[in-house]
Amino acid sequence: MSGSGAMEGQLTLRAAVLGVALAVLLSAANAYLGLFAGLTVSASIPAAVISLGVLRALGNANVLENNIVQTAASAGESLAAGVIFTLPALVMMGYWPDFPYFQTVLIAGVGGLLGVIMTVPLRRALVDDSPLAFPEGQATAAVLKAGYGGAGAAGLGVLAGGAVAGALAKLADSGLKLWQGAAETSVTLANQSSFYIGSYLSPALLAVGYIVGINIALPILIGGLFAWWIAIPLVMAFSSDAGTGVAATQAVWSAQIRYLGVGAMLVGGLYALWGLRGSLFGAFGSTAETVLPSQRDLPRSVLITLLVVLAIPMAVLYVWLLDSIVGGVIVALVMLAAAFLFSAVAAYMAGLVGSSNNPVSGVTIATILMTAVGLWLFFGAEQAGAASAIIVGAVVCCAAAIGGDNMQDLKAGSILGASPRAQQIAQMLGVVAAVFVLAPVLSLLLHAYGIGPVDAAHPNSLPAPQASLMMAVAQGVFEGGLPWDWVIGGGLLAFATIGLDGVLARRGSGLRMPVLAVALGLYLPLSLSVAIAVGGVVSAVSGAKPGEHGRGLLAAAGLITGEALMGILIALPVAASGRPDVLALDLAGLPLAWPGMVLMAGLAGWLWILTRRDTSAH
């Protein structure tokens, strides 16, 4: 069977058209949501559910065709995240008066396509030859299989029950504001050190922890506990103006401690690539004759050609920005190297916690730091240097966002028996479709609401929190004030974690300390790490075994599906009205925390019961 024959019934015209349409819609919706709230909604599972309904109504659909639709559609959402986390910084710093169409399309398109290209040689290393869970990939595959009867009537009922529970919880929490999104408090000692205690009340995070298991959830929690129970209290103890309480701990984390995670991600990413060197060389060295047609990736000749074609216009842009041919070429090479490094890091971390919880902003900060320092050393403190660093960061952020999403989709495809080449083409289609609508959408939002801090002219301005952080990092290098000590400290912690993991490996310990999992814990809010850890504990005590796809996995997939779908539905009236509380019930005493805690406990118990019953049946 030829390579094209392996794609028959998958990359159909109607699948491509539907995938492109969903990519455009979801990229526009997530552009607003990301600027407004600082987060985006994962599109793989919602797109899978939508495509199930549309393609089955058209007739003669199959699960692999649906998989192509969600692959293309999810690219739009991921690209939107890369764009809105970075490019608004150029507007806020005054370098761009608006979002110029050609430059926005070029930066986003190059970054998104690089994300696909850079992760092609990683597929076998991370998906085929790795124990990484890719929780959203598993959940997407479970949804699609259930939709075509692969789970049976009972399994489909479990999936639907989880989806209803996840959707209602999201509606009550984020829409109606019946309870708080997180249960949190703090304990303050006599020396003014505050210890944060809390957890997100998110069924989807509980499900992610259940899917990845305790061996990944625990190192993430350990990283979080180090940041929030050791580093932050120490900073507060020796600072006279840090304050106390939950808000104070979060302020210290935002300004200083999360840079530990940035440094750790940088070192951990390089270490992870070194560990994957054998698989990478094997991927580059394989030939078409050594791989089954159904398992072939895009050819190396195509990847290399695309790489050159994408690099040339970016090099020209950097030459124009810096007014230096040598400088522009060097920055373009740095961009390519950083795109490969951090696409790999994002792909690896998507395997740990899923693309929804992937800290793409962390790898973007690391990129902007490295680029800005180099530009400052060679070109001095000029605004063009800060802008160039932001643009490099934007390309890498788009590449990392697409890289993590691409690997998640390829995991789903691996479970379903899909053609990797067909999925990689679908990802590129989704990227190309989304780039042409993001520039006008961003310009529309800029003129309608404003982007950046609220002022008299823009009382409803969209805060764009990640882009504000990127601007602060880039300008901080040229103007001073960045917490370099914390970045370096994070790198040293990564080296220590690598050493500890080596000791555990030599002793044959069942507990390991993967450095990127610990780095993730250092960077993320502790409330997120705790919610994932709870799911990991449920998985461990219920006897769930990695790789098994029983009713517990279907329930977890349902929880993720319901929350993701409801997140998009809630975003529609919020976007239309410009009010985050448009659905909130104005009732005295709301929101509360305890109803969400009771719900989380009940869902944890449900996952435990389902898994125990499956375990007992075997």
Give the role of each language-model region:
Residues 1-618:
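Alpha-helical multipass membrane-protein architecture
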